[in-house]
């Protein structure tokens, strides 16, 4: 067996890529900090029940599990930090007002989300708890766009959806849970033939307006005309009207900051835990979303304290492959002269100023120090910074 081999979709991050990821992380975290989001560091490993709180069966399948040798209970390696942040808000901070939290660390998946992705994403996210109004949805989405912008993502296409449109059709017509899940699966897969068969055979007693609305949902994808069609053809349920109003309000507010906004009223991603508006950000060069988010008001219920919540998360590894940040820094090569106090003082000042200074060790070949494009050279009794000669 070759001991240096890594499992599939697990990789080392080498210096240039690691530098780019770390630079983006600092830029994004600084953006979150100045908006009042407090940094938390949940554990990599905890009991499975906590990690699965408020999530669907998909999270259970994505999670690596081990038996705790101390308690005998099943533990999991986190596949998503959102439930952990919700646990911290609900059970540890336990405040009544608005709480803003952010996080940045690795998560681990049993299988990659996409064929081009890793099983160890570096997840960065922001969560806002304690406010149920559209204003907090707008704050989170604006913050996401600012984070993408400072990361070097220039062209952003935003998809907006709302879970309550589909859910209102289900609950307003009394559809049984087993049919709800079948309808959800058909819509999620965009399987219009299965959807048609369900509403005409399995649900033949369904109200005509609800039946037509369910069949229309996959077609409600596109620009702002989608909302006009939805208002015209969907049932006049109060929750549907409110959902469409929220989508319109957010789209108008965000329009100046994105290249394009698309509405998708059949987007049921995260249906098992999302409760309101959902969104996804895309950019050129990526066939999949670069950031996901939405409202999930019930997630804290599993920890004994349901709170309104909305947030987003993204994978810095994925983002780093799409950004135009490519300023891998060069350094200054200093000779090995431990007795030279003037040289030592100059090196110290350069490092304080943020410059990279590499001290060449005895026997080290300076030509191999490829990261350095300048030398410290003694000229006329003074140390000077000079370009590395050809």
Swiss-Prot record:
Q: Which residues cross the membrane?
A: none
Pathway field of the UniProt record reads: Amino-acid biosynthesis; L-histidine biosynthesis; L-histidine from 5-phospho-alpha-D-ribose 1-diphosphate: step 1/9
A single GO BP term for this record reads: L-histidine biosynthetic process
Which UniProt keyword terms apply here? Amino-acid biosynthesis, Cytoplasm, Histidine biosynthesis
Any one Gene Ontology cellular component term annotated for this protein: cytoplasm
Location within or outside the cell: Cytoplasm
Q: Which GO terms describe its molecular function?
A: histidine-tRNA ligase activity
Q: Which InterPro entries does the annotation name?
A: aa-tRNA-synth_II/BPL/LPL, HisRS-like_core, HisRS/HisZ, HisZ
What is the annotated role of this protein in its UniProt record? Required for the first step of histidine biosynthesis. May allow the feedback regulation of ATP phosphoribosyltransferase activity by histidine.
- What is annotated about its quaternary structure and interactions? Heteromultimer composed of HisG and HisZ subunits.
For this chain, the family text in UniProt reads: Belongs to the class-II aminoacyl-tRNA synthetase family. HisZ subfamily.
The record's misc note reads: This function is generally fulfilled by the C-terminal part of HisG, which is missing in some bacteria such as this one.
Q: Which NCBIfam families match?
A: hisZ_biosyn_reg, PRK12292.1-1, PRK12421.1
**What is the protein name stated in its UniProt record?**
ATP phosphoribosyltransferase regulatory subunit
Primary gene name? hisZ
